Swiss-Prot record:
It comes from Ectopseudomonas mendocina (strain ymp). It catalyses: 1-(5-phospho-beta-D-ribosyl)-5-[(5-phospho-beta-D-ribosylamino)methylideneamino]imidazole-4-carboxamide = 5-[(5-phospho-1-deoxy-D-ribulos-1-ylimino)methylamino]-1-(5-phospho-beta-D-ribosyl)imidazole-4-carboxamide. It holds the Pfam family His_biosynth. GO terms for biological process: L-histidine biosynthetic process; L-tryptophan biosynthetic process. This is 1-(5-phosphoribosyl)-5-[(5-phosphoribosylamino)methylideneamino] imidazole-4-carboxamide isomerase. Belongs to the HisA/HisF family. The active site is at 8 (proton acceptor), 130 (proton donor). The lineage of its organism: Bacteria, Pseudomonadati, Pseudomonadota, Gammaproteobacteria, Pseudomonadales. GO terms for cellular component: cytoplasm. Its main location: cytoplasm. Pathway: Amino-acid biosynthesis; L-histidine biosynthesis; L-histidine from 5-phospho-alpha-D-ribose 1-diphosphate: step 4/9.
Length: 245
């Protein structure tokens, strides 16, 4: 299982939100490229970037920062989400060296767009499912739909989606533990690999994910915990690599 540091971009800075609220953000760095360097030097094998402004505005806003990080680390798999609503945006990011694009809101509102994107950019598309009580939320979590996360995941199986990033909104940024049960249930319900996100606080939370013994869970995204020092990226990755259960 991969430990994937998150860099959330707002107005060019690296921030963390609580439960997706833009008004409840903490700035951790004014230099996201240097922050990326810190996690790379700490041994991370993939980076998770989110354009928060883009998620709310429906188009990339912090694209230059994303491109700068991708150019600095051409051999590092990078995934980007937030404001990806057109094939042109995907092409821009892929050309910039980004490994994966995460389609969130549009995947819920127009599932056929995921099919198109997977055909145009095979192996490059991740679907981001952000859920509240099992129902998928959209538009920067401002709206909660009537669509179940497990149902939507099954819908994308035939498209060739590389992974699903599953976030439990109630847990995100709160550092109260990941929703292991819901994450494992999603991994069991779908053939698409799942990346857990939201709420990871320490090594104990990583262990709980591993103890779920779900081969479908391939990674865990962590944000506030690594910024506030309750989780060490290198230590957590080493723990995953050596885990025997």
């Amino acid at each position: 299982m991969l430990i994937i540091p998150a860099i959330d971009l707002k107005d060019g800075a690296c921030v963390r939100l609580r439960q997706g609220r833009m008004e409840d953000s903490t700035v951790f760095s004014d230099d996201p490229v240097s922050m990326a360097a810190k996690w790379v030097e700490g041994g991370c094998r993939r980076l998770h970037l989110v354009d928060l402004n883009g998620a709310f505005e429906g188009q990339p806003v912090n694209g230059e920062v994303v491109t700068a990080i991708a150019k600095r680390y051409p051999n590092l798999p990078i995934q980007i989400g937030g404001g990806i609503r057109t094939l042109e945006t995907i092409e821009h990011y892929v050309r910039a060296g980004v490994s994966y694009v995460i389609i969130g809101t549009k995947a819920v509102k127009e599932p056929e767009f995921v099919t198109e994107a997977c055909k145009a950019f095979p192996g490059k598309v991740i679907v981001g499912l952000d859920a509240k009580d099992g129902f998928v939320a959209t538009d920067g979590w401002a709206e909660v739909s009537s669509v179940q996360a497990t149902d939507l995941a099954k819908r994308f199986e035939a498209d060739g989606v590389s992974a699903i990033v599953y976030t439990d909104i109630a847990k995100d940024g709160m550092m109260q533990g990941c929703n292991v049960e819901a994450t494992a249930a999603l991994a069991a319900a779908s053939k698409i690999p799942v990346i857990a996100s939201g709420g990871i606080h320490n090594l104990g939370d990583i262990e709980k994910l591993l103890l779920a013994r779900s081969p479908g869970i391939i990674g865990a995204i962590t944000g506030r915990a690594i910024y506030e020092g309750t989780l060490d990226v290198a230590e957590a990755q080493a723990f995953c690599d050596s885990f025997k259960g």
